[in-house]
Curated annotation (Swiss-Prot):
InterPro entries in the cross-refs: Cu-oxidase-like_N, Cu-oxidase_2nd, Cu-oxidase_C, Cu-oxidase_fam, Cu_oxidase_CS, Cupredoxin
Residue positions with a glycan: 74, 77, 156, 209, 233, 242, 276, 317, 358, 366, 393, 402
Protein's job: Lignin degradation and detoxification of lignin-derived products.
Subunit field text: Homodimer.
Binding residues for Cu cation 4: 425, 481, 486
Residues noted as binding Cu cation 3 in the record, renumbered to the chain: 134, 430, 480
Molecular-function GO terms, alphabetical: copper ion binding; hydroquinone:oxygen oxidoreductase activity
Keywords noted in UniProt: Copper, Disulfide bond, Glycoprotein, Lignin degradation, Metal-binding, Oxidoreductase, Repeat, Secreted, Signal
UniProt-recorded name of the protein: Laccase-5
Catalytic activity annotation: 4 hydroquinone + O2 = 4 benzosemiquinone + 2 H2O
Chief site of localization: secreted
Residues given in the record as Cu cation 2 binding sites: 89, 132, 482
Length: 527
């Protein structure tokens, strides 16, 4: 770590070569984190920004690349925290657990006025990912953006003609009050932003600019849909067009035709859109499950515009979805079978997580997650190897190496009270993808070819979503609700995977070791 160490020449070159929707950078780049005012929906507020923009710049690379992303912390607004970390959502970080970015699990935060180099390779993954602050609720204030790893040998390449910066679509909830200053559990966002623009339906809003995505009639587009949400899930659709899903959370899946996609916080889908309709403008809709849930006046909307169509807003009407996405219809393209034996409990270790809520905090197995002062990885490197020795007490579970693991998330109602209010809760596992052998809304188990992903909705009362994965990646890995306000309220645990081999598998750089002493020396006003 150092004072403003910079790859600025590389960044300048990257920016000069892009200049498209997001202004793509990477895989070697600076990423400066700073505060600035933004007005994405007609209302101005201070925000936490990556690269000075919302959403943050698209970061790209190819399968097999080494990513070297130098995060420079220039934050000055203490109401949104001056420190930061960056999590690379969906990247396995095999051998680089220290670069996973979860504050107080994998690292101490980067102090304001300092920088830290995230240096990791992506040898066997390609697809659609994203990055965000993983410190408290900071990403709700703006620090979030898309990340794409391209595959030069993409098995689906014959299905589309266009896949570039212009075909990335981000969906974000937006709040006019800083997360630390607002309610612990907001009732809903003030607006929904599609590629960083949206409309606010309240006072001071109005007909602000919306994102326009342009297509050419006759071409096939691979759109990469990324939910960078802090809370709501969205029902996404494009008037007059079906979508063919080919990728789920960085995993190729068999082609599946749908006309709407319910996408939860942290999830991603690639879909093919065939621009085979009349030259015109069509509404793109992303309706949240909380807040304003219609599209009157262009809220929750963007525009799909065919080349040569008039520069006007669409007049298309929403129709009832007839082939909505159903998670159980998604089938992985390669090696589709779930780990373990094809029967209930047919794994080396099975565990059911007991959720509860006391009005202010969420609990898993009667413990609410309170971030430790010493990161879990540092605890392991310092000699703590078993759950009894690892902090926070009761929130760290050790997992054996090279084992099959089954985790269940029962959502139950007792005496009229839901064990986890605010459902459905999307749960994200760091360091892995998993097979969803029982999905929300389903009572059956599928061990032969279940969807494989890294973020799953745990559904509503009566659901018992069940996942399986293999412990092949030593290190501490966060498992948490991706509604960021719920994570802040303790809805998380840590898997201490193969603690005995964690140190040898994850050699840490000196700069990582310097993070905690620097952070621990900060005045409370600089945290």
């Amino acid at each position: 770590m150092g004072k403003y160490h910079s790859f600025v020449n590389v960044v300048a070159l990257s920016l000069s070569l892009s200049g498209r929707v997001f202004g793509a950078i990477g895989p070697v780049t600076d990423l400066t984190i700073s505060n600035a005012d933004v007005t994405p929906d007609g209302i101005t507020r201070a925000a936490v920004l990556a690269g000075g923009v919302f959403p943050g710049p698209l970061i790209t690379g190819n399968k097999g690349d080494e990513f070297q992303i130098n995060v420079i912390d220039n934050l000055t607004n203490e109401t949104m925290l001056k420190s930061t970390t960056i999590h690379w959502h969906g990247i396995f970080q095999a051998g680089t657990n220290w670069a996973d970015g979860a504050a107080f699990v994998n690292q101490c935060p980067i102090a304001t006025g300092n920088s830290f180099l995230y240096d990791f390779t992506v040898p066997d993954q390609a697809g659609t990912f994203w990055y965000h602050s993983h410190l408290s609720t900071q990403y709700c204030d703006g620090l979030r953006g898309p990340l794409v790893v391209y595959d030069p040998d993409d098995p689906n390449a014959s299905l589309y003609d266009v896949d570039d910066d212009t075909t990335v679509i981000t969906l974000a909830d937006w709040y006019h009050t800083a997360a630390k200053l607002g309610p612990a559990f907001p009732a809903g966002p003030d607006s929904v932003l599609i590629n960083g623009l949206g409309r606010f339906s309240g006072d001071g809003g109005g007909a602000t600019n919306l994102t326009v995505i342009t297509v050419t009639q006759g071409k096939r587009y691979r759109f990469r849909l990324v939910s960078i949400s802090c809370d709501p899930n969205f029902t996404f659709s494009i008037d007059g067009h079906n979508m063919t899903i080919i990728e789920v959370d960085g995993v190729n899946h068999e082609a599946l035709d749908v006309d709407s996609i319910q996408i939860f916080a942290g999830q991603r889908y690639s879909f093919i859109l065939n621009a085979n309709q009349s030259i015109d403008n069509y509404w793109i809709r992303a309706i949240p499950n909380t807040g304003t849930t219609d599209t009157t006046g262009g809220v929750n909307s963007a525009i799909l515009r065919y080349d040569t169509a008039e520069d006007i807003e669409p007049t298309t009407n929403a129709t009832t979805s007839v082939i909505p996405l159903t998670e159980t219809d998604l089938v992985p393209l390669d090696n589709p079978a779930a780990p373990g034996d094809p029967q209930v409990g047919g794994v080396d270790l099975a565990m059911s997580l007991d959720f509860s809520f006391n009005g202010s905090n969420f609990f898993i197995n009667n413990e609410t997650f309170v971030p430790p002062t010493v990161p879990v990885l540092l605890q392991i490197l310092s000699g703590a190897q078993d759950a009894a020795s690892l902090l926070p007490n009761g929130s760290v579970y050790t997992l054996p190496s090279n084992s099959t693991i089954e985790i269940s998330f029962p959502i139950i109602t007792t005496d009229g009270v839901l064990n986890a209010p605010g459902a459905p809760h999307p749960f994200h596992l760091h360091g892995h993808t998993f097979s969803v052998v029982r999905s929300a809304g389903s009572s059956t188990f599928n061990y032969a070819n279940p969807v494989r992903r890294d973020t799953v909705s745990t559904g509503n009362s009566g659901d018992n979503v069940t996942i399986r994965f293999t412990t092949d990646n030593p290190g501490p890995w966060f498992l948490h609700c991706h509604i960021d306000f719920h994570l802040e309220a303790g809805f998380a645990i840590v898997w201490g995977e193969d603690t005995a081999d964690t140190a040898s598998a994850n050699p840490v750089p000196t700069a990582w070791s310097d993070l905690c002493p620097t952070y621990d020396a900060l005045d409370s006003s600089d945290l």
